A protein has these predicted regions:
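Extended alpha-helical interface modules used as scaffolds for assembling large macromolecular complexes
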Residues: 1-105, 109-113, 126, 132-141
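Short glycine-/polar-rich loops that comprise or flank the Walker A/P-loop
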Residues: 80-82, 118-121
Length: 141
């Protein structure tokens, strides 16, 4: 439970390093054979967030702009901002950073934040096996 709380706190604080650290510790506990595609990682993160963040409605595959977000955190109160998460699975460690950049670019190019506040948080996550990488941006670039 400690790691789950650390992860959800890191998401709320928009702290990419702490998100990566908690996620890696969580992923180390399972077999990489279970992490077969992007959906595997989406399910892990959704489960972590859904059970721990009471200020948000956590949804997958929400139609936004010109596509569907991998994960969307809709705030339940006006003092919170929406968060859009896009996931990428890569085949090598060197592809982690470019994949997080591509995830943020996809959110912008497909206009997933259309009609949302300019401070909407964009989170690009890439995974190489049990190694996560996180990049955080916002809708107003």
């Amino acid at each position: 439970a400690r790691l789950f709380k650390q992860f959800s706190r890191a998401v709320g604080d928009r702290n990419a390093e702490k998100m990566e650290k908690a996620l890696q510790e969580i992923l180390v506990g399972g077999s990489y054979l279970n992490l077969v595609d992007e959906n595997s990682y989406i399910l892990v993160v959704m489960t972590l967030l859904r059970g721990l963040i009471s200020d948000y409605d956590v949804r997958t595959e929400v139609e936004q702009g010109n596509g569907r977000t991998d994960l969307f955190l809709r705030p339940l109160s006006s003092n919170k901002v929406p968060m859009i998460l896009e996931f990428k699975k890569v085949d090598s460690e060197k592809d982690l950073v470019p994949a997080t950049e591509e995830a943020i670019r996809q959110i912008r190019d497909k206009r997933y934040a259309l009609g949302m506040p300019s401070d909407t948080v964009l989170i690009g996550m890439a995974f190489w096996g049990k190694v996560p990488k996180v990049l955080i941006g916002n809708a107003n670039r």
